[in-house]
Amino acid sequence: MKDIDIGKEYIIPSPGYRSVRERTSTSGTHRDREDSKFRRTRPLECQDALETAARAEGLSLDASMHSQLRILDEEHPKGKYHHGLSALKPIRTTSKHQHPVDNAGLFSCMTFSWLSSLARVAHKKGELSMEDVWSLSKHESSDVNCRRLERLWQEELNEVGPDAASLRRVVWIFCRTRLILSIVCLMITQLAGFSGPAFMVKHLLEYTQATESNLQYSLLLVLGLLLTEIVRSWSLALTWALNYRTGVRLRGAILTMAFKKILKLKNIKEKSLGELINICSNDGQRMFEAAAVGSLLAGGPVVAILGMIYNVIILGPTGFLGSAVFILFYPAMMFASRLTAYFRRKCVAATDERVQKMNEVLTYIKFIKMYAWVKAFSQSVQKIREEERRILEKAGYFQSITVGVAPIVVVIASVVTFSVHMTLGFDLTAAQAFTVVTVFNSMTFALKVTPFSVKSLSEASVAVDRFKSLFLMEEVHMIKNKPASPHIKIEMKNATLAWDSSHSSIQNSPKLTPKMKKDKRASRGKKEKVRQLQRTEHQAVLAEQKGHLLLDSDERPSPEEEEGKHIHLGHLRLQRTLHSIDLEIQEGKLVGICGSVGSGKTSLISAILGQMTLLEGSIAISGTFAYVAQQAWILNATLRDNILFGKEYDEERYNSVLNSCCLRPDLAILPSSDLTEIGERGANLSGGQRQRISLARALYSDRSIYILDDPLSALDAHVGNHIFNSAIRKHLKSKTVLFVTHQLQYLVDCDEVIFMKEGCITERGTHEELMNLNGDYATIFNNLLLGETPPVEINSKKETSGSQKKSQDKGPKTGSVKKEKAVKPEEGQLVQLEEKGQGSVPWSVYGVYIQAAGGPLAFLVIMALFMLNVGSTAFSTWWLSYWIKQGSGNTTVTRGNETSVSDSMKDNPHMQYYASIYALSMAVMLILKAIRGVVFVKGTLRASSRLHDELFRRILRSPMKFFDTTPTGRILNRFSKDMDEVDVRLPFQAEMFIQNVILVFFCVGMIAGVFPWFLVAVGPLVILFSVLHIVSRVLIRELKRLDNITQSPFLSHITSSIQGLATIHAYNKGQEFLHRYQELLDDNQAPFFLFTCAMRWLAVRLDLISIALITTTGLMIVLMHGQIPPAYAGLAISYAVQLTGLFQFTVRLASETEARFTSVERINHYIKTLSLEAPARIKNKAPSPDWPQEGEVTFENAEMRYRENLPLVLKKVSFTIKPKEKIGIVGRTGSGKSSLGMALFRLVELSGGCIKIDGVRISDIGLADLRSKLSIIPQEPVLFSGTVRSNLDPFNQYTEDQIWDALERTHMKECIAQLPLKLESEVMENGDNFSVGERQLLCIARALLRHCKILILDEATAAMDTETDLLIQETIREAFADCTMLTIAHRLHTVLGSDRIMVLAQGQVVEFDTPSVLLSNDSSRFYAMFAAAENKVAVKG
């Protein structure tokens, strides 16, 4: 097996799919065919995109699966258009496809009749479930379409290279054939829509002016009008049918391609999690809309040209004027649409930032509550929201202009044309005037769809840029080199590695230069420039590997140079982290890796996993990986699925793994044993349980190389010891194991120990050899003294099964607990299913929205403005008909001595009067339009902002149990997708809907005014309409709801996959995660596609009603020949023609607007149903400002359970902690240690008893008053995106000197001082640009600053090496000498110095005394734990 040489020639991969090019010394020779499955082909010989993707994942391809997947339209034996052409048969009798859309003939496609069966089911049942909905057609499946799009993108990259590659061009090629066809259908629509008014209506009106009646001729005209309208309606439906399928294919393809790319990324640091979620939710939607609506733009110019030619023929040169108005308005509307899109683009950036911030808040909500920082975070989100609102308002004004212009343009064009026409002395008849008005009306179609089209295309253009930047990000390197000797598993020769430009981990000691990050406040424009610079910088790095871009600590330029030249490029620098690493790891060896915080331990592991950039030397690997990350990654799935991780269930191996990882006692108390569902990020597990499940996953995977990154730090001492012996030493005996740890006692048993310092391996050998060497390792080991004291509990089995009664987290997202005994399996479900609304959107939801917009009065004002607006438009058309009627035979003129009756309008002596009022109506209309636009935008924005603020307030004030049972993806969905609907789409649709409803009523009213008998015909049509509406309403609403609830799972899948990227890479599970994603996406696409089709299904049927109305009007004109003035006949027919498209559009808007209101309903559901914590502050009950002065803590019969119906986790706990006392709290996982903290912070309210601090009952005071006086250093360090300063002091309460002092005492001053912007340096999302140890030190600095009287330490030094640990313990002792301190410990040596030790078991205090008393009693539990530990140190030390 030959491999890619990653030696001196190793390069940073070029962006895109060609990220690891073959570089061989024998460049001309071609590799053997059978070797190809482990490498990527040369770009020019690129085969199927799936193979390329599979190779990137390092997967072999099963031939049968491969051939099965290659059945694409292109490879169909009858040609790639076979499926499409078979749809041209008018009616198809065979039903060989599973989805009815694939069996539909042309007639069924045009009328969407294939959907009728689902409409019947929906009507019958009153609701729809996923079982009722057809799964997606194979032609729309994301898998098939993604491979096609991927192939086209690959070809584009090969032809022009990544920089010049155009994703727009690729998307166009992907959709080209179908879009061209849809444009052809659109042309037919436009021609039919134009010829109806231009020819049929004109002849009908001329017939009304004629004196003789000719019934046969006139009925033929009505029939002609009927046929042109049917052709117009059905060809338009066919356009939509084509566009929707194209859109669904494009959305599925590009979203799958995006996720595929995310799975292959080294890291996602260039993009925030919020941005990736937005790309995969909103941007996918934008692509669909562009494909669905974008092509309608082509219809505009055609109608404009036809209309202009026709008007000139009818009116002469003045006909140009009206068309000129249209032509001028067209670019004006385009400009307004472009401006809307420009503001939308700015808005998207603000939304990204808000969603990212929300994601952070939700992830660390427990910590935010504990620190009483809710207000600070609330203000930061509100600040971003204010900026977003400002941009939304500007976008809203321009959007309102584009929405309201279409009906006005007809009036303006008519006024200008007819006024000038008459002023110039030309005559005007009713036939001429109303034919021109009717043609103008048909021309408004172009103006109506223009805002939609331009908006969708502009937004898609932004989305395409975001997708392209994602597709060009660098991929992970799967190291393919094999070591020379078969017995060596990992070989590194003189390897120098760096975190590349997009990675952020500092991962080096404070003495090394931490990576510079750009100042977050730099403008967005600068960010784009930097991204472009980044690509050129890549080449610069290659050319200059030892140059100034790769600075070591001793090569740093002066601060002045730094500032001038490098600050804006800070994040582009490759930060050398590992230097000249020489390492050979033999097969079957257990290798321990240790070193101080930031010495490069995690970097070494990342290098082996291919996540760093190799600058010099080589790396060779032989074997497959299992990886246990420092912070365990848990899926939202059952506990068993988390361990199996896609492998077959083997009972014997599975049971052996459970025993090795001490998981049996945990299973005994979980509601459904190993079938219990685990919440997102392991929300309902303790830190120790998460770590053990992660370890069990590694053991079960049966790989050859095991990489364990500090896996025992979160475990109780005796559990850790058992796992080290049974899992790592015994279970993995024949495997190669890299074991990173801070717990030095385990290194005694390792075959080899590697000691790291400042990114170098400084000592290496067995434990004995390193002790004899008397170097850094020996010094630290001797300093340990008693060392870690992990006991092997004497009666471990009996003890563990009895003592572990609950499991709950000490990490940032937790607070759940399990039952004491096995219960009904359904109780194993922690995460509740998402609620799905029933029936129609209740009126109360509309009421809530109206109330939020300003109440009933504001609503009435807005409605009155709409009425006046549409009324002024209708008035101007009526005035024209009145003017024509007055000029038709009512005027007497004198020629010479003769007086005669003239029917010419130009002879009317009051022409000036009529013309003035006609022109004035236009001015009034424009003023009303402007007022209405401003008032409407203000109202809807006030509504959405109030809903957002109230939702946000409710979420922040919800108790912890809500966050434990609700996936973050679901809550985020409210703030991203639902908020996007309420902010942007709902106002857009509601404005058009209200305007059109009023217009429909005016149309029917005008026609009925001319022909009262018309109302008789309207009756049956109203009944037909009601039936249609009842049926379609259920169908459309239910499909929209299904679309909403299938959206959350695939967003949650993206979130969780991104968080576990390193684990997915290590286990090579990319393909499985991709398949799961495709399933979830297709599950969402199925109801989404049917929802869009259901709209058109309704539209086609409504068109038949409006065609019936126009035919009725035509028949009335024919049958009442000579009884009504031609001017009024013209008025009636012009409104009837206007009604055709308008009617179905309005009803569709009604359904769509109701569907958009489901987002308001979902937001309102949270606002109404979420229970709230106690108030932050309670008037008249606030404690004194200097409370607590002493720090005495008293528990009196305290009882607590996490949620209703769950067992107690604290049972009648009573004790008193004296002021300034230092208490160590020990006990098995689930004994209730962290529950004490939860009770003290009131994250969970007590079920009985009380807690007092300095005699004040904490349940009587406000939460903020309580929590701001307590401090906690959590087990898992929490840093927020922002600056170092904002992380330490979000309220700006402390001086710079105080902050530097806190950093100095936590040994972080040097590290922060070396950052270019010092305290203002950027902290990335999750604190990813600091190592875990450094994050923990910053958390301790934060607690030092707060300096509260009561401090809880939740095993705060678990992620630190022993040396730093000892220093920090000393700092804490000194700094908090006058504080009451509770230390929740896993490692016994951390609590030996405590004044008293509390031993917990099963939620009760079983021992509470000084360490000396407990150790002198040989029957105490603490003694048993300590004796075992003492024994181990004595033997091993």
Swiss-Prot record:
Glycosylated residue positions: 494, 636, 684, 890, 897, 1044, 1329, 1417
Compositional bias (Polar residues): 501-511
Regions of compositional bias (Basic residues) in chain numbering: 514-529
SMART domains: AAA
Sequence positions that bind ATP 1: 595-602
Gene Ontology MF, one: heme transmembrane transporter activity
Modified residues (Phosphothreonine): 513
Topology relative to the membrane: Multi-pass membrane protein
Residue numbers bearing the Phosphoserine modification: 14, 19, 60, 505, 509
Catalytic activity as recorded in UniProt: ATP + H2O + xenobioticSide 1 = ADP + phosphate + xenobioticSide 2; 3',5'-cyclic GMP(in) + ATP + H2O = 3',5'-cyclic GMP(out) + ADP + phosphate + H(+); 3',5'-cyclic AMP(in) + ATP + H2O = 3',5'-cyclic AMP(out) + ADP + phosphate + H(+); N-acetyl-L-aspartyl-L-glutamate(in) + ATP + H2O = N-acetyl-L-aspartyl-L-glutamate(out) + ADP + phosphate + H(+)
Keyword Isomerase: no
InterPro entries found in the cross-reference section: AAA+_ATPase, ABC1_TM_dom, ABC1_TM_sf, ABC_transporter-like_ATP-bd, ABC_transporter-like_CS, ABC_transporter_C-like, P-loop_NTPase
Stated family: Belongs to the ABC transporter superfamily. ABCC family. Conjugate transporter (TC 3.A.1.208) subfamily.
Protein name per its UniProtKB record: ATP-binding cassette sub-family C member 5
Species in which this protein is naturally found: Homo sapiens (Human)
